[in-house]
């Protein structure tokens, strides 16, 4: 092959590889699941305002345990899993679950 043809073929190959890589990278759902959801945590939240708690254990997406509280107004907030208030809230939830 002549050098200009070789360069053109190389450029076309690089362009195709970039397009293929870019197409796979557009999966925003996958990308958002591969990082920690809780970048900041609230120091405290009232037990009465919590509708539900979601605990996500450490994994390949995040090395930390994450606790996300859904409040009665629909807002989701991150809580410190080591916080003493959260430990009290978890005990209250477990206690209320046993009594029902």
From Swiss-Prot:
SUPFAM superfamilies: Interleukin 8-like chemokines. Keywords: Chemotaxis, Cytokine, Disulfide bond, Inflammatory response, Secreted, Signal. It is found in: Secreted. PROSITE patterns: SMALL_CYTOKINES_CXC. GO terms for biological process: cellular response to lipopolysaccharide; immune response; inflammatory response; neutrophil chemotaxis; positive regulation of cytosolic calcium ion concentration. Disulfide bonds join 36-62, 38-78. One of its GO terms (cellular component) is extracellular space. Induction: By lipopolysaccharide. One of its GO terms (molecular function) is chemokine activity. SMART domains: SCY (SM00199). InterPro entries: Chemokine_b/g/d, Chemokine_CXC, Chemokine_CXC_CS, Chemokine_IL8-like_dom, CXC_Chemokine_domain, Interleukin_8-like_sf. Transmembrane segments: none annotated. Residues 1-31 form the signal peptide. Belongs to the intercrine alpha (chemokine CxC) family. PANTHER family: C-X-C MOTIF CHEMOKINE 3, SMALL INDUCIBLE CYTOKINE A. Ligand for CXCR2. Has chemotactic activity for neutrophils. May play a role in inflammation and exert its effects on endothelial cells in an autocrine fashion. This is C-X-C motif chemokine 3. It comes from Mus musculus. The lineage of its organism: Eukaryota, Metazoa, Chordata, Craniata, Vertebrata.
């Amino acid at each position: 092959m002549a050098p200009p043809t070789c360069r053109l073929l190389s450029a076309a190959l690089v362009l195709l590889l970039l397009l293929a890589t870019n197409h796979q990278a557009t999966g925003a759902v996958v990308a958002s699941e591969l990082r920690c959801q809780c970048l900041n945590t609230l120091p405290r939240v009232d037990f009465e305002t919590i509708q539900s708690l979601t605990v996500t254990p450490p994994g390949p997406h995040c090395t930390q345990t994450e606790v996300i509280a859904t409040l009665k107004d629909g807002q989701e907030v991150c809580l410190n899993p080591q916080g003493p208030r959260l430990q009290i809230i978890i005990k209250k939830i477990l206690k209320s679950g046993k009594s029902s």
